Amino acid sequence: MVKVAINGFGRIGRLVMRIALSRANVEVVAINDPFITVDYAAYMFKYDSTHGKYAGDVQYEGNTLVIDGKKIKVFQERDPAQLPWGEEGIDIAIDSTGVFKELDSAQKHIDAGAKKVVITAPSSTAPMFVMGVNEEKYAGETIVSNASCTTNCLAPLAKVIDEQFGIEEGLMTTVHSLTATQKTVDGPSMKDWRGGRTASGNIIPSSTGAAKAVGKVLPQLNGKLTGMAFRVPTVDVSVVDLTVKLNKETTYDEIKAAIKAASEGKLKGILGYTEDAVVSTDFLGDNNSSIFDASAGIMLSPKFVKLVSWYDNEYGYSTRVVDLVEHVAAN
């Protein structure tokens, strides 16, 4: 049984807890969020506008959440180094704040007594692992990143295509649901002027490091992929459009067959496959990292193709966070 603590009880933190509670070998013993009280944590965990009401029992007493009879301590500490992770016997701290995402800042959890840290965001200094893609390279590192939701969608698809047909170069666009960093009405956003515009009424071009990050988890693709994002007014589920120039001539049917085989084989549960006439809401709550939409892609020539793959950027990603926690604990 791996004892975990969740730092940051936002969209990802709460879904990670829902998923962790369903795993027999993961025990959530504590959460920390300086911005919410225990009664509010109970409310936010119980009610979810996107994924629905939690099916079990949610109570609180003192500074403790009681979920399905299980007690989980709630802390409100701004500095992770001050948390009692040693005293609580924390094996892995899951940092889902989006703040402590580099080795030096995530180290605070280690200083507090946690044995390992899993960061739920891309990191420029911590090693990144994408389940189904490069997790076998994990060699006991103390602090690791689960990369981003978009990298988790793109990397399994890129891996299959590169292994079967070779990727010469490619461009990715993610059409991405809005997130908490965006504004309900036009507001100040000095680092990203467009990002400060009304989220619910605009298609907003944005940057993303997700495609370049694939080169970190699949070194053979380093420098071969880059990408951008469009933020759109949907609450959850996003879609990757990967346009690639291949090394080897092929047909679209051969590409579909290769992806279908991977989805039923070594990437089962990570990479999904559908030929149905689907739309974004059909993937709410889907725990795959990436679901290839066979009927949405197009091919211009035997080496030039556009591939489309969906992902629940909240639920699918949070599922992978818990998978990585289990993998780190076992290795």
UniProtKB/Swiss-Prot annotation:
Positions of disulphide bridges: none
Residues annotated to bind NAD(+): R11, I12, D33, R78, N313
Pathway note: Carbohydrate degradation; glycolysis; pyruvate from D-glyceraldehyde 3-phosphate: step 1/5
GO biological process assignments: glucose metabolic process; glycolytic process
Activates thiol group during catalysis (site feature) positions: H176
Pfam families per the UniProt record, alphabetical: Gp_dh_C, Gp_dh_N
Catalytic activity: D-glyceraldehyde 3-phosphate + phosphate + NAD(+) = (2R)-3-phospho-glyceroyl phosphate + NADH + H(+)
Positions annotated to bind D-glyceraldehyde 3-phosphate: S148, C149, T150, T179, T208, G209, R231
KW Aminoacyl-tRNA synthetase (keyword) present: no
GO annotations of cellular component type: cytosol; external encapsulating structure
Keywords noted in UniProt: Cytoplasm, Glycolysis, NAD, Oxidoreductase
EC number(s) recorded for this UniProt protein: 1.2.1.12
Cell compartments where the protein resides: Cytoplasm
GO molecular function: glyceraldehyde-3-phosphate dehydrogenase (NAD+) (phosphorylating) activity; NAD binding; NADP binding
PROSITE patterns: GAPDH
Active site: residue positions: C149
Subunit structure: Homotetramer.
Family the UniProt entry places it in: Belongs to the glyceraldehyde-3-phosphate dehydrogenase family.
Protein name per UniProt: Glyceraldehyde-3-phosphate dehydrogenase
Organism name: Eremothecium gossypii (strain ATCC 10895 / CBS 109.51 / FGSC 9923 / NRRL Y-1056)
Taxonomic lineage of the native organism: Eukaryota, Fungi, Dikarya, Ascomycota, Saccharomycotina
